[in-house]
């Protein structure tokens, strides 16, 4: 991978991961346009580091707000921790249930099927982008009626919606969870904070999963160039640079997202997702 390719993938990941436009769809399409294989183990380590960069961007950006909301007192911490636990539990039940169900169903006709085989499917990505766009636009009409609180029930709904995003590249996690909160009357700032708190809880599990996939690729000899004398440092150096780039891009993306939420421009992201779905169909 050239420096230009690394730069493009890192910036796309940093912005799209934290904007409600689906980072996976954008990164996969960018990799395809540049002739890179989005399912190759070689890119797995880079993507792990890019996700790490955006996770740190979320922590840095929201830390002051979370400290006032989540860590202001012991009761506040317990209450918010319970909301996160309830939402994450539903994410696991719905998300991993879907992953297992889809894999089981597809293996009836394709014995060697793995869920990763769906990730590069342009039609599925386009459909998921369109669905996310519609959800964002519909929820934007509720922005003027946000007087509710974030209850355990609402947190569980948000967690379930997050679970629906796991198998489908193009269905923006942040877009879906923030939209779900807004649609249920949760104040937009609270919905945004909770959505990204959920991301920080979920991201380490994703990193472990992708890291294990990379380890298996090395152990199985899928990364042949590592067996011919090159060390992991050959991949680590560009991955660390990518992590820094995605961190900086992520901070800019979060500021952009917060401003548009405050200014009532949430629906613009939905319109973008609808347009992007058409582009994915045309290019894919």
PLM segments and residue spans:
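Multi-pass membrane proteins that catalyze or facilitate reactions on polyprenyl-/lipid-phosphate substrates
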Residues: 1-284
């Amino acid at each position: 991978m050239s420096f230009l390719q690394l730069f493009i993938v890192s910036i796309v990941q940093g912005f799209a991961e934290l904007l409600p436009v689906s980072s996976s769809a954008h990164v996969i399409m960018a990799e395809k346009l540049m002739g890179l294989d989005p399912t190759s183990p070689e890119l797995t380590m880079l993507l792990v580091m890019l996700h790490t960069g955006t996770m740190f961007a979320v922590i840095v950006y929201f830390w002051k707000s979370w400290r006032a909301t989540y860590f202001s007192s012991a009761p506040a911490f317990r209450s918010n921790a319970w909301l996160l636990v309830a939402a994450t539990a539903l994410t696991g039940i719905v998300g991993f249930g879907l992953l297992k169900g889809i894999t089981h169903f597809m293996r009836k006709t394709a014995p060697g099927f793995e869920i990763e085989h769906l990730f590069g499917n342009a039609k599925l990505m386009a459909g998921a982008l369109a669905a996310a766009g519609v959800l964002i636009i519909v929820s934007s009409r509720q922005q003027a009626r946000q007087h509710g609180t974030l209850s355990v029930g609402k947190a569980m709904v948000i967690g379930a919606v997050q679970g629906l995003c796991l198998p489908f590249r193009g269905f923006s996690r942040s877009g879906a969870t923030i939209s779900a909160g807004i649609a249920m009357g949760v104040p937009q700032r609270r919905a945004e904070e909770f959505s990204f708190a959920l991301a920080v809880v979920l991201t380490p599990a994703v990193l472990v999963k992708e890291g294990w996939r990379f380890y298996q690729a090395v152990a199985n000899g899928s990364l042949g160039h590592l067996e011919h004398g090159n060390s992991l440092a050959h991949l680590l150096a560009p991955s660390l640079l990518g992590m820094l780039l995605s961190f900086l891009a992520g901070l800019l993306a979060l500021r952009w997202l917060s401003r548009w939420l405050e200014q009532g421009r949430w629906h613009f992201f939905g319109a973008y997702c609808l347009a992007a779905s058409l582009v994915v169909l045309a290019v894919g």
